[in-house]
């Protein structure tokens, strides 16, 4: 799908919103939909992240997948609020001079054109701050979990050799880094699941 087609995708999204209570969300009336411990998620948050996620993930919203994508957006927002609490508790910050680098990395790692994504968001009057919140949370969470778990991980030569057999284009160091990142991600996912299990989540 081209980026011009993604602009048309937003028209589909807007139709979906019109047929849903989410369509009523705007910057003057934010209805609280979910409480996550002491954090809130409003209908406006859900509407904005629903649209932005569909753009980033290159998904065409239909009557068949709309409800599923809505639930995924809600679950992602719950996870994001839990992540933000931990990020604040550990005082993880992204330095201003590093923010552009991390933002560019976010788009490049997903093979997305940053300028075109920004233009689509602007043309369709979506909230760019919602995208920036997602990016900053993702980057800060990665920094936090690396700090928490990196020192607990040990990669064996056998694991490295096995990966190199499957892909001989990798260097020894790159193979080790890939395996390390995978282990950090697994521990990060479990950490988030544990936080969610302990959280007080109230849907209104």
Locate each region found by the language model.
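Short, conserved catalytic-motif segment at the N-terminal edge
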Residues: 53-65
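Bacterial N-terminal signal peptides
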Residues: 10-19
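A short acidic/small-residue loop/turn micro-motif
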Residues: 48-50
């Amino acid at each position: 799908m081209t980026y011009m087609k993604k602009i048309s995708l937003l028209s589909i999204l807007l139709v979906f919103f019109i047929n849903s209570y989410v369509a009523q969300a705007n910057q003057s009336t934010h209805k609280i939909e979910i409480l996550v411990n002491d954090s809130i998620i409003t209908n406006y948050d859900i509407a904005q992240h629903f649209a932005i996620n569909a753009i980033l993930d290159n998904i065409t919203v239909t009557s068949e997948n709309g409800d599923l994508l809505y639930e995924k957006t809600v679950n992602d927002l719950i996870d994001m609020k839990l992540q933000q609490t931990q990020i604040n508790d550990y005082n993880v910050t992204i330095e201003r001079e590093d923010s552009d680098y991390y933002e560019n990395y976010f788009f490049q790692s997903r093979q997305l054109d940053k300028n075109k994504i920004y233009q689509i968001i602007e043309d369709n009057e979506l909230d760019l701050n919602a995208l920036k919140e997602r990016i900053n949370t993702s980057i800060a969470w990665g920094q936090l979990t690396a700090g928490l778990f990196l020192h607990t991980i040990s990669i064996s030569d056998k694991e490295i050799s096995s990966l190199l057999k499957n892909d001989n284009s990798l260097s020894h160091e790159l193979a080790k880094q890939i395996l390390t990142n995978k282990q950090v991600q697994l521990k990060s996912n479990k950490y988030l699941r544990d936080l969610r299990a302990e959280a007080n989540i109230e849907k209104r």
